[in-house]
């Protein structure tokens, strides 16, 4: 029984990870007006009857449901494996059915997620840039250059006035536009090290 329980547990673990991916896709695609809207998912069915223009994340929602079912199958396998006595377990039919069913539906869900969603994801570059520019977290990248206190003060002002951090830094003359662009570039902020600083510095 131990091998089947381990196999079923591995499916559950995969389902947890896959479910997280599906939930992240749902979150990142929320829109069109409210929500993050950082990505657009392929439309696989007509949109909402109460919200024209909305594309429902139908495939990620389906994947979440499959992952819940796989978790349930694993719970059944574990309970049935525990129900045996000594070297005999008459629960093998329900153990086998749930392990095979979980494997089958999880495999199909991954195929559908890839072919009907992942392969067609489009980044909303303008929206991503807008959210990055409005985020006060970019002040963290400025700290090595203007100091923590000044960066924190700028972040607070940006939140209070709903203005981009970049505009406030330029207005105060703390850094020139070229240097600021280098520090606040997406590439610089998503690489290891201090944004805008060369590796030999």
Language-model-detected regions and their locations in the chain:
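Conserved, well-structured ligand/cofactor-binding cores
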Residues: 1-201
